[in-house]
Design a protein with these regions (language model features):
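Core catalytic alpha/beta fold that binds nucleotide/phospho-ligands
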Residues: 1-214
Length: 214
C-alpha cells in the first residue's frame, strides 16, 4: 500500500505520535462500505483488515472496539467518489468532505439551521462567492459536531464557525471555550471541499493521497 508519491503507508503509520494528525485522501465507492477504513486502520494497528473491529458509540459515531479504542482515534467522511480518513492519538478528530456543487437554497438552509452570524456573513457575499463559502462552512460545522461525537442532532445553531474568505476558526460553542478548539480547511482537490476539527492544542496535519482504492 503506497501513496501517490511512492511512500510506504506502513512506514508513515509507524510515525504517528501525539503531535500530528494523519489525513488520508482516497478514491471510494459506496459499495465498499467500511472496508477501506478497516484496511487503513489495520495498517496502524498491525492487524489484517478482517481483524479490525468497529462499533458505533451511543451517538452512532464509529470507533475501534476495546482495547484498540484507547490507542487510536479516527474519523472519516466520503462524498462523490472520494473519502477522507483522519487518524490521531489522544484526541477525537472530526472530518468532513463534500463535493462542490451549487445549492440553490443555501441561504434558506443557513437561516433555518445556522448561527445568525454565519447567515449574516453568507448574505454579505456575492452569489459566486457564497456557493463555495456555504460548502466550506458546512464541512467546518460537520467536522466540529463529529469531533464532539454528537452529529447534527447537537444543533448547528449552538456554535459559530468563521465564513470564508476568513480563515477557518471556531468562534463560539455553547457550553465550551471555543479557543480550546482547532479547525482547518483541507485541500481535497478541485471538485471537493473539506474540513478537520478537534478539541485540544494545535497539532501539525500530515496529508497524503493513496495511490489506489483500498
Amino acid at each position: 500500500m503506497r501513496t501517490t508519491l511512492g511512500h510506504d503507508v506502513a512506514g508513515i503509520a509507524g510515525g504517528l505520535n501525539n503531535d500530528v494528525i494523519h489525513v488520508w485522501l482516497l478514491d471510494y465507492r459506496r459499495e465498499l462500505q467500511r472496508e477501506p477504513l478497516k484496511a487503513l486502520l489495520g495498517v496502524y494497528l498491525g492487524l489484517p483488515a478482517e481483524s479490525v473491529i468497529l462499533r458505533n458509540d451511543e451517538h452512532g459515531r464509529p470507533e475501534l472496539a476495546a482495547p484498540w479504542n484507547a490507542l487510536l482515534q479516527f474519523n472519516w467522511s466520503h462524498s462523490a467518489g472520494k473519502a477522507l480518513i483522519a487518524v490521531a492519538r489522544g484526541i477525537t478528530p472530526g472530518i468532513d468532505i463534500e463535493r462542490v456543487y451549487v445549492r440553490p437554497r443555501a441561504l434558506d438552509i443557513a437561516e433555518r439551521f445556522f448561527h445568525p452570524e454565519e447567515t449574516a456573513a453568507l448574505t454579505a457575499l456575492n452569489e459566486s462567492q457564497r456557493e463555495l463559502a456555504f460548502l466550506q462552512l458546512w464541512t467546518g460545522k460537520e467536522a466540529v459536531v463529529k469531533a464532539l461525537g454528537r452529529g447534527i442532532a447537537f444543533g448547528l445553531q449552538r456554535f459559530c464557525v468563521s465564513v470564508p474568505p476568513a480563515p477557518a476558526q471556531l468562534l463560539w460553542l455553547d457550553g465550551e471555550e471555543a479557543a480550546q478548539w482547532q479547525l482547518h480547511a483541507l485541500d481535497a482537490g478541485a471538485q471537493h471541499v473539506a474540513s478537520l476539527a478537534w478539541r485540544g492544542p494545535s497539532r501539525s496535519i500530515a496529508m497524503w493521497t493513496l495511490a489506489e482504492a483500498l
